[in-house]
């Protein structure tokens, strides 16, 4: 490799990430009579596993203004809260394309009609926190029956799930996706919540809370 003395500057716009957008898609799905339009999202097929899972659960998406950009396909995505949310027996073949999104998918499955089953997902326990164990404990905390092993979880959905108690989510390992999943649960299911370590959301989504507030989410930040 031959080095160069000077590098040329350039401008490059990075398309929006579907993984981050999925938290707001979940908020839409879990809120009655809601709709959402996400702009200029990267819809590379390797990143669309969660969307494909949600389609199987009865969520309908519209893709508009598709175009190629720097070798990627970007598109606007429109989604509405479904009248009926179905459970899913998720094929293992879909796991690798949705591994980072399973936490929020589990929350959605908690309000689906029927029993959802996810298997061969032991990798979740080797993320920023043991996410499969954390998810199972979280679902039990909010009254959702589930049965988990080291690499699977069965979730008994409740379409009428609503919360009215007091809930505390410690998130002791400061997992950004655990914090964002908990926040979406608090905003859509009700109850009074205290969720620790909001700053960890900056790991992958620095503007998460700002956007939550922009679309009407109400919360207060407290210093430790």
Question: What kind of region is each of these model predictions?
Answer:
Residues 1-224:
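Short, structured segments at the rim of ligand-binding sites
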């Amino acid at each position: 490799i031959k080095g160069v003395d000077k590098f040329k500057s350039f401008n490059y716009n990075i398309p929006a990430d579907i993984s981050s957008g999925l938290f707001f898609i979940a908020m839409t799905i879990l809120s009655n009579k809601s709709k959402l339009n996400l702009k200029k999202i990267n819809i590379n097929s390797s990143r669309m596993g969660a969307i494909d899972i949600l389609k199987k659960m009865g969520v309908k998406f519209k893709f508009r203004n598709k175009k190629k950009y720097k070798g990627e396909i970007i598109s606007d995505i429109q989604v509405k809260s479904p009248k009926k949310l179905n459970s899913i027996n998720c094929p293992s073949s879909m796991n690798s394309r949705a591994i980072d999104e399973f936490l929020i998918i589990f929350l959605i499955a908690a309000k689906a009609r029927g029993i959802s089953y996810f298997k061969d997902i032991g990798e979740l326990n080797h993320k920023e926190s043991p996410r499969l164990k954390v998810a199972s404990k979280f679902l039990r905390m909010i009254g959702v029956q589930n049965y988990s092993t080291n690499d699977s979880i069965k979730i008994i959905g409740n379409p009428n799930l609503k919360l009215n108690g007091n809930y505390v989510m410690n998130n002791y390992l400061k997992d950004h996706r655990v914090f964002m999943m908990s926040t979406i649960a608090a905003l859509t299911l009700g109850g009074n919540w205290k969720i620790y370590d909001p700053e960890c959301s900056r790991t992958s989504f620095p503007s998460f809370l700002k956007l939550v507030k922009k679309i009407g989410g109400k919360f207060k930040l407290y210093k430790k």
